[in-house]
Amino acid sequence: MKQPARTSQVKKPAARVKRKTREEINQEARDRKREKKHSGHASGSRANPATVSQKGDKSQSVKDPRIGSKKAIALGTDAPVRQPANPVKAAKPAVEKKPRLTPEEELAKLENDERLDALLDRLENGEALSAEDQAWLDQSLDRIDVLMEQLGIALDDDAEDEKAEEDMYRLLKGSHRTPE
């Protein structure tokens, strides 16, 4: 098969662009440099800012862009105390902070807790506890263990003390026999 001839492939000569001379290129570069030099703010623009007129706020004084205040502050003790324009409202105590209990007080409080006693009695009687009650009971018992450990109290502390005293007494007496 023969390919059809394409007539659109023939390129037409484009219009020639006139090349700039070296003098024209240099002049354009100088113009760009001159414009670039004057692109910043005018001298003194920070100290004397241009005022932008606003339609609604004509009564408002011009605000100083610099940080700080120009108001005089009385340094003497006889200066009158000024109240702020918007007095600060006292914050409402949403939740009063409970006074922090010492470990001894917290342990005594937990040992005298009626709910804890009732739940322990129910467990001793073989009753099943709800998941919520069981979780609270476990948490309370864990806290009691932590407090007792902090205070150096052990459950069988008394029996060990008596045994240790007997051993010390026998060592001091010179009797090396072991107790029966």
Curated annotation (Swiss-Prot):
GO terms for molecular function: GTPase activator activity. Residues 1-102, 158-180 are annotated as: Disordered. Residues 21-32, 55-67 have a biased composition (Basic and acidic residues). The keyword Endoplasmic reticulum does not apply. Residues 84-93 have a biased composition (Low complexity). It comes from the Bacteria. GO terms for biological process: ribosome biogenesis. Keywords: GTPase activation, Ribosome biogenesis. Interacts with Der. A GTPase-activating protein (GAP) that modifies Der/EngA GTPase function. May play a role in ribosome biogenesis. Belongs to the YihI family. This is Der GTPase-activating protein YihI. It comes from Erwinia tasmaniensis (strain DSM 17950 / CFBP 7177 / CIP 109463 / NCPPB 4357 / Et1/99). The gene is yihI.
